Amino acid sequence: MTTKKLYFLSISIIILVAISIAIYITLNSNTKTRLTNDSQQQIDKIIEHDLQKGHIPGASILIVKNGKVFLNKGYGYQDVDKKVKASPTTKYEIASNTKAFTGLAILKLAQEGRLNLNDDVSKHVPHFKMNYNGQNETITIKQLLAQTSGIPSDITSEDAVTNKNNRLNDVTRAIMGDELHHKPGEEFEYSNMNYDLLGLIIQNVTKQSYTKYITNSWLKPLHMTHTSFKQTNNKSKHDAIGYELQGSTPVVSKPEFNLWDTPSAYMMTSTEDLEHWIKFQLNPPDKYKSLVQQSHKNLSSTIGEPNANAYASGWFTNNDEHLVFHSGTLDNFSSFILLNPKQNYGIVVLANLNSEYVPKLVEHLNTQIVNHKRYSTVASILNQYKDQFNIVTVLMTTLILLAFIFSAYRAWQMRHGQILLRRSKRIAVLSWLTLCLCIAIALILYALPYLILGSNNWSFVLTWLPIEIKLALITTLIALFSTLIVILLFLHTKITKT
């Protein structure tokens, strides 16, 4: 067989095998609607991989689907020094995920007729006023909910707020008369102060403290009996220790905080308690169904916000994927809650470190749930053929060694003048064709996770693939390009006649 025929035969086989695998898995992705044991193992690998990459000391993770808990588990440590492991009962500061409780409380008070969303804030917060271009502007409750009040995101910086202004009433008075960034109702600008003001409105309307009203009206009825609000940096038995990274090492962190930020940032809860909250959000009782649906409705467009189309009542929304979600970040904690009411599942990640890997982990878990049929099929097929993949690894390693020996021998021949380089238009054309085919094969390999699994990339897939498959993939890739190098050497060299 000529080199040219061998070349095209090799490439054709590789492409056909790749396409066949993709078609087979796509057509045979018929599995149970529940997450399988393989999926559970995949999820554990994904979580452990992302926590390790983010140097996150501890996290608790909850997945609810179709009203059932598929995962409620702790990973790592809630207290590294004392070696206390994280668990579903570990309490974390959930930061901005507090806002959804505040938003729902406001909507309930409006439903009861105790306030109107179009009310001027000053109706419920006497003497409150803020300016735009030097003129007093009216801000409505709805604009606070939608984050379109014009209140600057940095209005409560340390320069403006001191320890003396540590109560919600005090800090609100401290910002009165300040300048807005834009006219109310015109632009989205995320600011904790919007929800702090909503917390103050709740206090003034109900004649109860914000924390007492939320506890009695929502936490107790939902059986979130271990959820509370931060009052001090002292820790109880189930409270996670917060950490900040110094280099790649987590160190204990106890930053100062202000009680006035409670309605927007300082609920403390666990995945055990949030299980009730997620089930309530996905399948609310009839008397709350319209209220929950209203809390998920878009109030403002969020141009420039990643993965979000709009802001609702304490939630970001993505209409394209039917997602309702919110992240939460403090100096030493982070959280992320994602809901998909259409497909009836929710994901919660709570961590004792402020890390970009928390939203990444949620994204990976969301992909796992959405594609779990394909993933389960892939895992099942691959696990059945581990021994065969080991054989592939041995064969590919042998091929790599042979290619290396041949290339080294060819180089030795060239050095001793035993072979000559070929130069012709035909060789040049074949060389360019080889390069193009290499690129095409590389693109096919790069796209395999999408072709087979529907989304994501190799870095995600490799977090849960068995080691046998990883080795087979790596050696096959190296063998492929080693073979192409050998073919190029055949094309470009010839043995001299003696």
Swiss-Prot record:
Pfam families for this protein: Beta-lactamase
Name of the protein in question: Protein flp
Species this chain originates from: Staphylococcus aureus (strain N315)
Described purpose of this protein according to its UniProt entry: Its precise function is unknown. Has no penicillin-binding activity and is not involved in methicillin resistance.
Listed GO CC annotations: plasma membrane
UniProt keyword RNA-binding present: no
Record keywords, A-Z: Cell membrane, Membrane, Transmembrane, Transmembrane helix
Xref: InterPro entries: Bact_CellWall_Synth/Modif, Beta-lactam-related, Beta-lactam/transpept-like
Transmembrane regions listed in the UniProt entry: 6-26, 389-409, 433-453, 471-491
Cited SUPFAM superfamilies: beta-lactamase/transpeptidase-like
Membrane topology: Multi-pass membrane protein
Subcellular location per the Swiss-Prot or TrEMBL entry: Cell membrane
Principal localisation: membrane
Note: Has two of three conserved motifs typically found in penicillin-binding proteins (PBPs) and beta-lactamases, but no penicillin-binding activity has been detected.
